[in-house]
Amino acid sequence: LIESEMIKKNGRYYLDLDNLENKMKGNEKVVILCSPHNPGGRIWTKNEQIEVAYFCKKHNLILIIDEIHNDLVNPENKHITFPKIVDDYFQNFILMTSTTKTFNIAGGLMGNVIIPNNSLRDKFQKANFATGETPNRFGMILGEVAMRSGHKWLDDLLKYLKKNKDVFDKEIESIKYLSSMRIDSTYLAWVDFSKTGDSENDNYKKL
């Protein structure tokens, strides 16, 4: 497992594919991309996602993309799902989504997996069938109803979350040495304690 630290610039996270490439040993098989990013909330741009696709194709890597937060995007932002960007250029990816985060129905234990590469999809299906697991019927119904009828509810939720974020950011900025990262998506917050001069454990105890 290789961990590639992102670059923090102007209070935002950016991918560092050069750093990742320098750490590679040549036996890597998979790259995992969280899009939008959790917990930093970054929505990767079209160009950033294209760069990841080029990187994976160059090194013959399977790209696993977690887009579970793709619906929880601030009203003023837009998330572009990976398949719409790469078209037929790069098909060696596994895209995972779910309605569970967006509609708070994690108890349904349901998700979606999209694999355009036929060979890779066959391998995935065989491995999945071998587990003996079957889809959760209740979860399937929950997900379908949410996708078909939940648009108005989701629009209201996103506006509500944006107001919460604005209030949270304002209050955090009023606290000396703390700053809140600007979040494009998700319902999470990411606060920088580095200027306090305290250790991670000390800050944890204070919280």
Short names for language-model regions:
Residues 1-207:
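PLP-dependent class I/II
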